[in-house]
């Protein structure tokens, strides 16, 4: 029997087919492996964006201007209603101060704002019991960040009128602090959200808020107790504390001994600085233990017109700066700062819970002279500015300030 042999060319063809199949499988396997590696190694665009580091805050500053007595009653209201500008009349030249160059304006509101209550200027002049139309606050909100209510007129319409005033301020997003009765210890200090500019690690600048304790003291009718002054210690280890007292003898060029001792005690109890009003005149200043004390700024928007003493005032420009803070801690402060615009907020408790300590602030002070002669508040002339600085003894005071406080 003969064996049938396969033809050599047929066997060669089968071998080639098997080899080709093997090569294809190897190439496919290698290609699939490379695709998998590429997928794992190169995350999607969205994944890349999600892990990209965010810029960190590196510094913060708030250029803040403090003003003296403000109210919109009595003859201010008469002049306003006689003007085609109506409720915007008292504010009609404030743009000349360059509001856009400041982060915040803070003043003292010296009248309640009760809706529907109309009093003649003659009656208010006779009784010295004031009321301001709440419509003025709709204009005031364009300029002022916060007001102190610690004075001898915010309760002229009783505590009900005072509470209504607080509500109208809230409606107009104007922060407030202080109480006409210094025995109301829970209302003396409040943490406000101080508007600020924040610098970031990528070179950008954004708006933010810094928690700052503002403390209002009414000391005209009764002297604030040591207990009330000591309240500032609760805030002093955590944030800047600004005392804004309303006290002392009126229409005199310098603080008396009693007022001097009271304001100095505020520094001893934790205030970074004291910025006062009430006497209707600009008064002296001093550096006490290196801290600035401004005894009286004078009238800013007021209806007294009979001489230069009552129409000029000293706006106090304070530049709050934080330059060398821990970035993580600064970010935490800024996050809390967003929540501090409400009255009686929980900002101090949040700061304590977060274990934060006071940021390394510096404070630079200067004087912006104002003049409300001819019924309208506006920047002071060079001559009036010079007189204000002389009354304040400003050049001597700023040479005696100590770090972190300085002046110019």
Regions found by a protein language model. Give the residues of each.
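Acidic, metal/ion-coordinating pockets
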Residues: 2-6, 17-22, 29-408
């Amino acid at each position: 029997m003969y064996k049938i042999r396969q033809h050599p060319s047929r066997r060669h063809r089968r071998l080639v087919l098997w080899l080709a199949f093997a090569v294809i499988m190897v190439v496919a396997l290698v290609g699939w492996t490379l695709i998998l590696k590429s997928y794992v190694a190169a995350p999607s665009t969205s994944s890349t964006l999600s892990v990209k580091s965010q810029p960190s805050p590196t510094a913060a500053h708030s250029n803040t201007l403090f003003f003296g007595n403000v109210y919109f009653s009595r003859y201010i209201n008469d002049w306003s209603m006689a003007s085609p500008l109506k409720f915007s009349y008292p504010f009609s030249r404030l743009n000349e101060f360059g509001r856009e160059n400041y982060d915040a304006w803070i003043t003292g509101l010296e009248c309640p704002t009760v809706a529907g209550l109309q009093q003649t200027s003659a009656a208010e002049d006779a009784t010295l019991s004031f009321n301001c139309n709440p419509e003025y606050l709709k204009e005031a909100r364009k300029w002022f960040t916060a007001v102190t209510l610690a004075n001898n007129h915010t309760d002229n319409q009783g505590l009900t009128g005072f509470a209504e005033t607080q509500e109208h301020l809230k409606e107009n997003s104007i922060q407030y602090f202080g109480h006409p009765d210094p025995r109301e210890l829970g209302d003396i200090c409040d943490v406000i959200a101080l508007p600020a500019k924040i610098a970031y690690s990528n070179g950008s600048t954004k708006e933010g808020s810094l928690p700052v304790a503002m403390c209002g003291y009414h000391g005209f009718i009764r002297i604030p107790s040591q207990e009330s002054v000591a309240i500032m210690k609760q805030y002093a280890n955590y944030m800047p504390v600004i005392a804004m007292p309303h006290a002392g003898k009126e229409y005199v060029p310098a603080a008396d001994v009693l007022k001097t001792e009271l304001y100095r005690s505020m520094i001893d109890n934790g205030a970074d600085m004291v910025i006062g009003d009430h006497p209707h005149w600009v008064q002296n200043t001093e550096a006490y233990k290196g801290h600035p004390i401004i005894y009286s700024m004078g009238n800013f928007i007021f209806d007294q017109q009979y001489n230069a003493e009552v129409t000029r005032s000293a706006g106090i420009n304070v530049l709050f700066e934080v330059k060398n803070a821990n970035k993580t801690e600064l970010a935490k402060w800024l996050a809390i700062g967003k929540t501090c615009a409400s009255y009686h907020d929980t900002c101090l408790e949040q700061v304590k819970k977060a274990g934060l300590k006071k940021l390394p602030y510096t404070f630079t002070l200067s004087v912006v002279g104002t003049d409300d002669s001819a019924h309208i508040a506006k920047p002071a002339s060079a001559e009036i500015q010079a007189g204000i600085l002389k009354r304040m003894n400003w050049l001597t005071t700023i040479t005696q300030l100590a770090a972190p406080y300085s002046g110019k």
